[in-house]
From Swiss-Prot:
Keywords carried by this UniProt record: ATP-binding, Cell cycle, DNA replication, DNA-binding, Helicase, Hydrolase, Nucleotide-binding, Nucleus
UniProt-listed PANTHER family: DNA REPLICATION LICENSING FACTOR MCM FAMILY MEMBER, DNA REPLICATION LICENSING FACTOR MCM7
Entry keyword ATP-binding: yes
UniProt keyword DNA-binding, yes or no: yes
Name under which the protein is recorded: DNA replication licensing factor Mcm7
Biological classification of the source: Eukaryota, Metazoa, Ecdysozoa, Arthropoda, Hexapoda
Binding site for ATP 1: 345, 384, 386-388, 489
GO molecular function: ATP binding; ATP hydrolysis activity; DNA helicase activity; single-stranded DNA binding
Binding site for ATP 2: 514, 604
Enzyme's top EC category: hydrolase
Arginine finger, short sequence motif: residues: 513-516
Physiological role: Acts as a component of the Mcm2-7 complex (Mcm complex) which is the putative replicative helicase essential for 'once per cell cycle' DNA replication initiation and elongation in eukaryotic cells. Core component of CDC45-MCM-GINS (CMG) helicase, the molecular machine that unwinds template DNA during replication, and around which the replisome is built.
Source species of the chain: Drosophila melanogaster
GO CC annotations on file: CMG complex; MCM complex; nucleus
């Protein structure tokens, strides 16, 4: 780095602050920093943020120097602003706090007692830190890329860097001493000691001329009323899951926040921090233990909280027109579903449900009450049906995800822990897996192995999407806007059809009802299916990739970007679909009342249908839900219920074939009447999971048996 002339830079900074202007929409010149200096002079604003893009436009080499030596230039900017402020003061400013009154009183006393011809003692003059009632921060260049924590290394020491991650812990905001003021017990003079680090050694002996000449030996006592304090907070930030290489532990970084950048984030927030990367030498007993090693921290200048739609990453760049055209094919829904874990054979409907979980529904907030849009799914089944593999793939695909197991997770580890802060010794909150997966997916394997007291911590998260904490005097609510993907094994090794769902999974009904879809994946012997599965597994084992199929699997990065694009849509449900959705829900309740349904059917199922429908509309990049979306959502719900119900029908010895089941649906639609529209039959049967060719075959079979007649246009069936 070239040597800089700081005196010349001071003049450039003074010119920049007073003369830099931009033209507004009307073509008028607007002095960007001049207006901020007026507010600073009138104490209407505390923080002045210097945009380095503006500085680069004015003087590019100066902007580069600020980035390379940020701490020094922060001090220079602060001194220049302190010089300029008196000229921008247009009116008298009244005292706003005790320190203002104190400074005003001391200046008045000094002007009275001091002889104008007398040289003022510099040691008793007010230090510049005491007189400055503003803060300076820098906004990084727009071309600056947000780094991951492991990318910030030794070459960034002293430079302005931008880092992104997730907040895991925040301390309470405490007052930090900037200038210590002492009063002598003999001569009454005041001494000031600027504090530039986290610790300092208090001054005891009075340095004034009176005590030194007279050898009075005056003692200094700290005067907190006249000292200056700023707000201080320490934040712990951890890498995002997508930034951690496989097999590595996520790294963390300490963020030191001072003044106006405190209270900008809480545990679970995804943030982008711009600040100065600096070493921290410990003192006292910690230095004896630490030796020559030093810790590092980031002195924050700017903190931005980002949500799921504002992810700052090169991977989340906009899709190109060619990629959108590739995804806009007729079979894009099937193609996206088959691209989920293509190495795993089959489970197409399960993969479709997992795709909708990644996209999610739309949150609703009527009158302050929140109705969640995130979709929760529980996969149950026999061992060896690739439940854990599906969870692992979803964990890798989701931008924000946490993977944990039931046996290795405690309630505290999932929600939040109260930790003792090593800096202040006070209790602080540290977010758990559900907090860290905020606005993402939390995959919990071996869900049935969790202890009951730990599992109760998930109840609030799955419906209210928050975590309420009341521990060690800390009472707060953390965000946990997360989709739960759980995998559970039957309690008896394999699913026992003689027992109910609760007895097989051993999960409480209150928890099972919070899942939008409960899917039972069985390992049933079937020669043709077993042959295809064995060929698929041996091919994957030999070639380390999935077998060639008619549909080419999409790249994981492309899928991630498309899902991110889908999440920006907020589709609504038109009024004309209301009767259709209500009728479908009433039918579900009727079947449950007739004890045909082994699962739970409650009002949560209706909300689940709405969530799945809006997720399907999002997947089409549409702004409104269509009837086909609702029909597909109902079909997935029926398929998940059938996975549980069919096994119990098998156990009872009555296994109706497809045509018999379709006939029962048609008979039910007809009721006491004789005629039924074929379009109504198609809608109801596809909702129940039947294919159109199966419905056509059933109609033809029963027409041959003279059970009903079909009109010439094949639009209506009339029973004989």
């Amino acid at each position: 780095m070239a040597r800089r002339d700081y005196a010349q830079d001071r003049e450039s900074i003074k010119t920049f602050l007073s003369e830099f202007c931009k033209c507004d929409d009307d073509g008028k010149k607007e002095f960007v920093y001049g207006s901020q200096l007026v507010k600073l002079a009138h104490r209407e604003q505390v923080l002045i943020t210097i945009d380095l893009d503006d500085l680069a436009e004015f003087n590019e080499s100066l902007a580069e120097a600020v980035v390379d030596n940020c701490r020094r230039y922060t001090s220079i900017f602060s001194d220049v602003i302190a010089e300029l402020l008196p000229s921008y003061k247009q009116q008298e400013v009244h005292a706003k706090d005790a320190l203002d009154v104190y400074i005003e009183h001391r200046l008045m006393m000094e002007s009275r007692t001091r002889n104008p011809m007398e040289q003022r003692d510099e040691r008793n003059s007010f230090p510049s830190e005491l007189m400055k009632r503003f803060e300076v921060g820098f906004k990084p260049l727009s071309t600056e890329k947000a780094h991951s924590i492991r990318e910030v290394k030794a070459q960034h020491i002293g430079k302005l860097v931008t880092v992104r991650g997730i907040v895991t812990r925040c301390t309470e905001v405490k007052p930090m001493m900037v200038v210590a003021t002492y009063t002598c017990d003999r001569c009454g003079s005041e001494t000031y000691q600027p504090v530039n680090s986290l610790s300092f050694t208090p001054v005891h002996d009075c340095p004034s001329d009176d005590c030194r000449v007279n050898k009075a030996g005056g003692r200094l006592y700290l005067q907190t009323r006249g000292s200056k304090f700023v707000k201080f907070q320490e934040v712990k930030m951890q890498e995002h899951s997508d930034q951690v290489p496989v097999g590595h532990i996520p790294r963390s970084m300490t963020i030191m926040c001072r003044g106006e950048v405190t209270r900008m984030a809480q545990p679970g927030d995804h943030i982008v921090v711009s600040g100065v990367f600096l070493p921290l030498m410990r003192t006292g007993f910690a230095q004896m233990i630490q030796g020559l090693l030093s810790e590092t921290f980031l002195q924050a200048h700017r903190i931005i909280c980002i949500n799921k739609n504002d992810e700052i990453s090169d991977k989340d760049a906009e899709l190109t027109p060619e990629e959108l055209e590739e995804l806009a094919q007729d079979d894009f829904y099937e193609r996206l579903a088959t691209s989920l874990a293509p190495e795993i054979y089959g489970h197409l409907d399960v993969k479709k449900a997992l795709l909708l979980l990644l996209v999610g529904g739309v949150d609703k907030r009527p009158d302050g009450m929140k109705i969640r849009g995130n979709i929760n799914i529980c996969l149950m089944g026999d061992p060896g049906v690739a439940k854990s593999q599906l969870l692992g793939y979803i964990s890798r695909l989701a931008v924000r995800s946490q993977y944990t197991t039931g046996r290795g997770s405690s309630g505290v580890g999932l929600t939040a822990a109260v930790m003792k802060d090593p800096l202040t010794g006070e209790m602080t909150l540290e977010g758990g897996a559900l907090v860290l997966a905020d606005q993402g997916v939390c995959c919990i394997d071996e869900f049935d192995k969790m202890a009951d007291q730990d599992r109760t911590a998930i109840h609030e998260v799955m419906e209210q999407q928050t975590i309420s904490i009341a521990k060690a005097g800390i009472m707060t609510t953390l965000n946990a806007r997360v989709s739960i993907l759980a995998a559970a094994n039957p309690a008896f090794g394999r699913y026992n059809p003689r027992r109910t769902v609760e007895q097989n999974i051993q999960l409480p009904a209150a928890l099972l009802s919070r899942f939008d879809l409960l899917w039972l994946i069985q390992d049933k012997p079937d020669r043709d299916n077993d042959l295809r599965l064995a060929k698929h597994i041996t091919y994957v084992h030999s070639h380390s990739k999935q077998p060639p199929t008619r549909v080419k699997a999409l790249d994981m990065n492309l899928m991630r970007r498309y899902i991110n694009l889908c999440k920006r849509k907020n589709p609504t449900i038109p009024d004309e679909l209301t009767d259709y959705i209500v009728g479908a829900y009433v039918e579900l309740r009727r079947e449950a009342r007739n004890q045909k349904d082994m699962t739970f059917t409650s009002a949560r199922n209706l909300l689940g249908i709405l969530r799945l429908s809006t997720a399907l509309a999002r997947l089409r990049l549409s702004d409104s839900v269509e009837k086909d979306d609702v029909a597909e959502a109902l079909r997935l719900l029926e398929m998940s219920k059938d996975s549980l119900n069919q096994i119990h029908e098998h156990q009872k010895g009555h296994v109706p074939n497809t045509s018999d089941r379709i006939f029962a649906i048609v008979r039910e639609l007809a009721g006491s009447g004789k005629a039924v529209k074929i379009s109504d039959i198609m809608d109801r049967c596809t909702t129940k999971g039947f294919k159109p060719d199966q419905v056509d075959k059933c109609i033809d079979d029963y027409e041959e048996l003279n059970v009903w007649q079909v009109n010439m246009g094949r639009t209506k069936i009339t029973f004989m």
